[in-house]
Amino acid sequence: MSKKLLKKERDPSILILDFGSQYSELIARRIREADVFSLVVSNFTSVKEIQDINPKGIILSGGPSSVYEDNAPKCDAKIFDLGIPILGICYGMQLMVKELGGEVTPAINKAEYGRAPINIDCESDLLSNVQDKSIMWMSHGDSINNLPEGFIKISHTENTLHAAISNKQKKLFGVQFHPEVIHSEFGMTVIKNFVYSIAKCKADWTTETFLEETIPRIKQQVGDKRVLLALSGGVDSSTLAFLLNKAIGKKLTCMFIDQGFMRKGEPEFLMEFFDKKFHIKVEYINARERFIDKLNGITDPEEKRKIIGREFIRVFEEESNRLGPFQYLAQGTLYPDVIESAGTNLDPKTGERIAVKIKSHHNVGGLPKDLQFKLVEPLRKLFKDEVRKVGGALGLPDEIIKRHPFPGPGLAIRILGDVSHEKLNCLRDADWIVRDEIKKAGLYNDIWQAFAVLLPVKTVGVMGDKRTYAWPIVLRCVSSEDGMTADWSRIPYETLERISNRIVNEVEQVNRVVFDITSKPPGTIEWE
């Protein structure tokens, strides 16, 4: 009997051709916020491949290059003759203009970066319901001098003659500003105008439709085979566990490797939650002593990560062999992971990796290449915010859905320098106080991450009538949308005072608390 072909996955309604923009991922997210499915693909994607996908609209992203430079990234110019609506953003607009016979040069007046009010010159489908003089986000050093035949100017700014252009007959549009950036006041209006009014997309990309399409597909893919999932307790692996449990039930086995670097009470919470409350089979692997022994005397942060990664691999291999055999490995790969695997490694039709490889455990290191698993990656086309919505629809509680991101190596990289039981206990208690007070203040869901860091130095203090010499704790709280950039959170002084007082009074070997007010960039969120 011939093997059944897997049901074809849905094609994107909007295809985003990436020219190296830092915002390409953000464009896709904004379109999905409008309940329209979008994918990012390489600018090398051919017209034939685009025709096979048959999107309702195409967006050409921005990029760091200038279109008149040698070796500037291009796309197949035949896309402009497909009759598919196209929106060029910044570099994408300039490329469209140049390819169709217009002229792009370095900005005559001056480059334009940051907020700029746009002046609307005429009515257009693209700028419908966008207020005149509204603020948009600019980031360009080139300008359009002459438009191709058939185009008109529909908007300008003080320094940019062509802030938005239109060729209504050919359904080609361009904006010099970035509508996807939150600083653009009516940016989402522009995106919706293109997606709905111009490209005629339907708002049919929802959590419900994702589940309706994905659960039968998982059942069909797995059949009666066994699936192994390395459970970390984060939102990605937890959502995946619930999704797979709903699809295949007892054919799923979760493996939770406790390496001893988790936050206070988390291993116990996870086992109680998954195994006992929701009856999802979890194999608990206590490898605490094994991991900490390997880190004895190690101070270099990269070496710590590598050691934890290697040991994770060894434990995973040993336990999967003991519990197996398994035919499938489930991974919480998300769409940003797929995008980062980049360009020629992506199938332009599906946005999936062509050469399937096992994803690196978050911040820890990859699993062995010779593990003979087939992959189950049902979240690979979702962004983090979409995963949270799926988790909520599947019944995951807020304790997991809204949990702050936590690095794979855990507290081992929040202890600067060498790691010991004493330092782990100290940091674990301090970190719990930080999160406890942030929650009591009603700030937890407004902050991307809030945690404690233990420094490898000691400071002088006075407690009672005695001189102390103990560790300082760093309080790190940041606000962010995606972790790519972050700003330090403005925590009320009263909350900071409570955190500091509790830590120095309740945590042994700590006599000082300092507050990190560094943004990313230049700093990173984690200290190691």
Swiss-Prot record:
Keywords for this protein: ATP-binding, Glutamine amidotransferase, GMP biosynthesis, Ligase, Nucleotide-binding, Purine biosynthesis
Question: Which CDD domains does the entry link to?
Answer: GATase1_GMP_Synthase (cd01742), GMP_synthase_C (cd01997)
E.C. numbers: 6.3.5.2
Glutamine amidotransferase type-1 domain location = 13-204
Q: Which reaction does it catalyse?
A: XMP + L-glutamine + ATP + H2O = GMP + L-glutamate + AMP + diphosphate + 2 H(+)
Please name the catalytic residues of this protein: C90 (nucleophile), H178, E180
Its Gene Ontology molecular function terms? ATP binding; GMP synthase activity
Could you say which residues bind ATP here? S232, G233, G234, V235, D236, S237, S238
Domain GMPS ATP-PPase span(s) in chain numbering: 205-403
> What pathway or pathways are given for this protein in its record?
Purine metabolism; GMP biosynthesis; GMP from XMP (L-Gln route): step 1/1
Q: Name one GO cellular component term.
A: cytosol
A Pfam family for this UniProt protein? Answer: GATase
**PROSITE patterns for the chain:** GATASE_TYPE_1 (PS51273), GMPS_ATP_PPASE (PS51553)
Assembly, per entry: Homodimer.
* Role played: Catalyzes the synthesis of GMP from XMP.
PANTHER family, from UniProt? GMP SYNTHASE [GLUTAMINE-HYDROLYZING] (PTHR11922:SF2), GMP SYNTHASE-RELATED (PTHR11922)
What's the protein here called?
Answer: GMP synthase [glutamine-hydrolyzing]
Q: Which organism encodes this protein? A: Prochlorococcus marinus subsp. pastoris (strain CCMP1986 / NIES-2087 / MED4)
Which gene produces this protein? guaA
